[in-house]
Amino acid sequence: PLVELTQHKASSECRFDRLAGRGLDTTDELCTFEQNLTDNLSSLGVVFGKMRAPEGAPVALEDYGRRNMVRNVLKDGLLLEQNSGINPFKLGFIGSTDTHSATPGAADEDDYLGHLGRRDAGYRNVQDHFEDNPGGLAVVWAEENSRDAIFEGMRRREAYATSGTRPVVRFFAGFELDPAACEKADFVAHGYAAGVPMG
């Protein structure tokens, strides 16, 4: 399976509360990136600068579901694998804009006009975008630029999420990889044989 790690509503990799000085089962201070501090999407129900639902209030770390954040799910999977030999949480990642305005790939902060199309045209709605962001992008390693090849790459989980930069990266992980693998002519075949494709 693939997880949408970031989109215009928020990111779900991890959460860190700078005021509390701690995170949700993590100590990474960079986990403040594009966060929705509620445990639902009610905070995105802001219309003309006013919150329409009381459920949109921020949720304290101790009340926030730890598996709302993907890093915690991955850690749980590794622990389960260590104890039982099975990891049910082998996930791939994608990012998306989740746009409703027919502008795929428009993830640039400087040009962000919103994601709702006609409703974004009015000047009063600009204040509503303080609760969201331009979103992310999905990067998929595919043998060719065709729908079938892209979906095959997604099935292999050779995909990753980015918040706007567009690097071209293909990488593998594993304990049996040769440190000099990048110098080999068949480094991709070696990656598949000795490791796991990571994007």
Spans of features found by a protein language model:
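C-terminal functional module detector
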Residues: 2-199
